[in-house]
């Protein structure tokens, strides 16, 4: 892909801290490509969940920075609401709406499944807001306290296998499907074949769309036109990788798909080269 085909990335100074280790997430591979059972994973909810995981990892344990010291508050990870909004690129002063987004994130239930176990769980077990000066006060600072379910917290704080993700890229995306696809492909970047897992296209749709799994699918050609192709184009436009779709057909119908991944080091991304190479 030539340099002109890349969408303009924000000036480096705007994201100078974004490419440092303080703005990176070690995301458990178990938390990449999530399939939703209830609710919907939108772009903002995906970004917000990543930001919450990042701050939990940075804090190291619950209870630190609690604005009001109580036994109950020792169970939460605490971070200023302004920091969450900044890191998730939430460009609004509407605190009420941001609280609604956190509630939506808490209400989402996801499916995790392997060869021996199937689990349905929430991404957040609880969240709370606190301001030492009073929630209705115009002064002071609003803090967000949040807690993960036990299985999620273990994956967040002690991931056995993880993928490094920089916020500088997630905050360039305009759709949740693009962010989800980027995370999946970043996970498989070090695969010697540079191919993702080969899966039925419906499983890809579940993971990328953020819609509840198994609750109806469009025709493949519609899913490809409206979801897969725009997401692939955006990943190739703004990130450090180039990807292409490989379709496997059963007769005349597409049954499975896989994505080929190539590392992109164009001049448009020259200041990310060291960051990317360190993870290879």
Predicted regions and their residues:
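Charged, alpha-helix-forming regions
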Residues: 1-280
């Amino acid at each position: 892909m030539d340099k002109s085909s890349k969408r303009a990335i924000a000036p480096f100074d705007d994201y100078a801290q974004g490419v440092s280790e303080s703005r990176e997430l070690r995301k458990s591979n178990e938390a990449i490509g999530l399939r939703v059972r209830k609710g919907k994973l939108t772009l903002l909810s995906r970004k917000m969940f990543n930001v919450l995981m990042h701050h939990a990892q940075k804090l190291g344990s619950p209870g630190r920075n609690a604005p009001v010291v109580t036994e109950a508050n020792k169970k939460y990870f605490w971070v200023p609401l302004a920091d969450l909004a900044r890191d998730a690129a939430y460009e609004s002063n509407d605190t009420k709406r941001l609280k609604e987004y956190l509630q939506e994130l808490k209400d989402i239930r996801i499916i995790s499944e392997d060869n021996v176990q199937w689990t349905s769980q929430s991404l957040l077990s609880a969240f709370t807001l606190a301001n030492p000066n009073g929630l209705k006060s115009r002064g002071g600072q609003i803090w967000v306290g949040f807690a993960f379910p036990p299985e999620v917290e273990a994956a967040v704080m002690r991931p056995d296998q993880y993928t490094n993700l920089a916020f500088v890229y997630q905050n360039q995306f305009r759709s949740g499907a693009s962010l989800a696809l980027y995370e999946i492909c970043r996970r498989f970047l070090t695969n010697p074949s540079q191919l993702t897992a080969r899966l039925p296209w419906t499983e890809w749709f579940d993971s990328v769309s953020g819609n509840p799994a198994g609750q109806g699918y469009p025709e493949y050609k519609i899913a490809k036109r409206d979801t897969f192709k725009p997401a692939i184009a955006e990943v190739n436009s703004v990130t450090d990788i180039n990807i292409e779709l490989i379709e496997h057909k059963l007769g005349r119908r597409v049954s499975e798909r896989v994505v080929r991944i190539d590392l992109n080091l164009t001049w448009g991304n020259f200041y990310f080269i060291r960051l990317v190479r360190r993870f290879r």
